Amino acid sequence: VIRVEDYLTSVISSEMSATASLELLKAHAVISRSWLLANLSGLQTDKLQLPVGNDTMRNKNANQDNTANCQLSTADCQLKWYERDSHTHFDVCADDHCQRYQGITRASTDIVRQAIAATRGQVLISEGKICDARFSKCCGGAFEEFQYCWEDIKYPYLAKQRDYLTGNKKTAPELPDLTQESEADRWIRTSPEAFCNTTNKKILSQVLNNYDQETTDFYRWKVEYTQDELSALILKRSGIDYGQIIDLVPVARGTSGRLWKL
């Protein structure tokens, strides 16, 4: 058992640099506290509506006792998602599935403790409820909406947005319609201006620990798999043997261009 504020002291030191600026650490403390308390308070409980009907069944490879970490089969679709119930013996885990937590012995600084103390008890609120404040170190240039990443729930505070200056179409064009394949293809294959599209070491040292800075292609990258490797990977992730994968066809994308149906 650990107190919330002690937990957060480690989280903001583990997720980002413990030597970041005070205001950045304070903002992260509020965001991380909001995510934690939203989940601990059970705001995620019983929201998931499982499909029903004669053409729907729970996949035989799914965990039968866990509705929040399961897999469903329909006549033409496989749906799999993961949530916090993938660990049932503790509230949150120590890695990116929840929040990076490297223990209370994690090296901290006076400025981290100051940020926690200055924001003690502060959370983000929307419509009277604590916000399920999801975050990432690099968004790829556009924020994604909650319903395309986790569950089919639309939160007004997790809306699509270009990660750049807004209001001036010359210096900050509007976010393209990345649900359209042609626009998404162009967006992904180029490197649009964005706050997180930077190689500035001073900026990166504010938000990344030293070991995270070893990665340099975090904004755009390329990974290649052989057909056998891809088939094995999908079998491992889904528990279903589809045989040899002949093609991967994009079917639906979220507002950031990320695939949610393939």
Identify the meaning behind each predicted range.
Residues 1-262:
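Conserved, single-site charged/polar hotspot
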